[in-house]
Amino acid sequence: MISVSDLIALFRRALSEKWGYIWGTAGTQWTALKQENLEKTTDADRALERAYGKKWIGHKVADCSGLFSWAFRQLGGTMYHGSNTMFLKWCAYKGELKAGQRTDRAALKPGTAVFVWNGKT
């Protein structure tokens, strides 16, 4: 079983090693080739990474779920990388959340996740 203290120790390790943030990564070393490939993209969502990615060449990088995915692998477990994958694989209930709509907190349990999706894959 993976313990919280073991996960926290790995997160602290990533902090002490000064890992960077690059969307779509999970504890890998950022290379010049990866940066070159990123710079060839025109996706507006990746503009910031194209701009600051060079500073992470030679360093380990991860995104939010990638850090968890990496840590779980280090401890012998598995976890899907990416909130879209988690949503599509594990969502027990799908519905609409409208602006101003509230939910009774009693319906939420530890582990409940709320995802906002724009309707695109």
What role is predicted for each listed range?
Residues 1-77, 118-119:
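N-terminal capping segments
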Residues 2-9, 17, 77-121:
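...with weaker cross-activation on analogous glycine-rich loops/strands in unrelated enzymes
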